[in-house]
C-alpha cells in the first residue's frame, strides 16, 4: 500500500546504494523526512554539488574536484611510486591504514572479459603512458585478492616489466586476532609463501 508516491520514489532511489535494501531504505527515508529536515536539505545540496563537481583526475583517475586531484598535486608525495588499486575506496583505506606516501592509479574495476572489462576500459593506456614518460621505480599492485584481482595484477606486472619497472604485490597474511583453524586455505598458503623475518609489532 502506498500513502505517498514521493516517499515511495525516495525509498526506491535510496535502494540504489550498495547494501541498502527496501526496509533499510524505508527507515532512512522516514528518518530524513520526519526527524532531520535541515540535515536532509544539506544532504540533498551536498549530493547535487558532488554530482556536478566531482570528476576523475587526469593522472590517476581518482575522484577529484579539479582536473588534477589533491594527491597528484601534492609536491611531498613520492613521485617514483605508483600504487594501483581497483576503487577510490581502496585509496582511502591505504591512506588511513598505512604510511604509504607515493602516488596512486585507480582502475575503477578489474579485468573481467565476460563483463566487457578489458585493459582499455580500466585506463591501462593512461598508466602505460605514465610508466613510459615518468621516472617511476616501483609499481605497487594493490588489486583485490580475487581471481579477477590476480588476473589484473598479472597484467600490470607485465606492463611494468615492459618498462623495466619493479612490480611489487601486497603480501597476504593472517589477520591479527584470528586463529589459524578458521583461516581459509588460500590465505594460509599465501601467508606461508609471504613469511618474513620475525619482528615485534
Curated annotation (Swiss-Prot):
Pfam families found in the cross-reference section: RecR_C, RecR_HhH, RecR_ZnF, Toprim_4
Zinc finger annotations (C4-type) as residue ranges: 57-72
Gene Ontology BP annotations: DNA recombination; DNA repair
Domain Toprim: start-end pairs: 80-175
InterPro entries reported for this sequence: DNA_Rcmb_RecR (IPR000093), Rcmb_RecR (IPR023627), Rcmb_RecR_Znf (IPR015967), TOPRIM_dom (IPR006171), TOPRIM_RecR (IPR034137)
Keywords (A to Z) from UniProt: DNA damage, DNA recombination, DNA repair, Metal-binding, Zinc, Zinc-finger
One GO molecular-function entry: DNA binding
Domain of life: Bacteria
Function: May play a role in DNA repair. It seems to be involved in an RecBC-independent recombinational process of DNA repair. It may act with RecF and RecO.
Family statement: Belongs to the RecR family.
UniProt protein name: Recombination protein RecR
Originating organism: Dichelobacter nodosus (strain VCS1703A)
Amino acid at each position: 500500500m502506498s500513502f505517498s508516491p514521493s516517499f515511495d520514489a525516495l525509498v526506491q532511489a535510496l535502494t540504489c546504494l550498495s547494501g541498502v535494501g527496501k526496509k533499510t531504505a524505508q527507515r532512512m527515508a522516514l528518518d530524513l523526512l520526519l526527524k532531520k529536515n535541515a540535515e536532509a536539505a544539506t544532504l540533498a545540496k551536498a549530493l547535487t554539488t558532488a554530482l556536478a563537481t566531482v570528476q576523475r583526475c587526469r593522472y590517476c583517475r581518482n575522484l577529484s574536484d579539479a582536473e588534477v586531484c589533491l594527491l597528484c598535486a601534492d609536491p611531498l608525495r613520492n613521485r617514483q611510486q605508483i600504487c594501483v588499486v581497483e576503487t577510490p575506496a581502496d585509496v582511502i583505506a591505504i591512506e588511513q591504514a598505512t604510511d604509504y606516501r607515493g602516488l596512486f592509479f585507480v582502475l575503477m574495476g578489474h579485468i573481467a572479459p565476460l563483463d566487457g572489462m578489458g585493459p582499455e576500459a580500466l585506463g591501462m593506456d593512461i598508466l602505460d603512458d605514465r610508466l613510459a614518460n615518468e621516472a617511476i621505480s616501483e609499481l605497487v599492485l594493490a588489486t583485490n585478492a580475487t581471481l579477477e584481482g590476480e588476473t589484473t595484477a598479472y597484467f600490470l606486472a607485465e606492463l611494468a616489466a615492459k618498462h623495466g619497472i619493479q612490480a611489487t604485490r601486497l603480501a597476504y597474511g593472517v589477520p591479527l586476532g584470528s586463529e589459524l583453524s578458521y583461516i581459509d586455505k588460500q590465505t594460509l598458503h599465501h601467508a606461508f609463501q609471504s613469511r618474513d623475518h620475525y619482528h615485534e609489532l
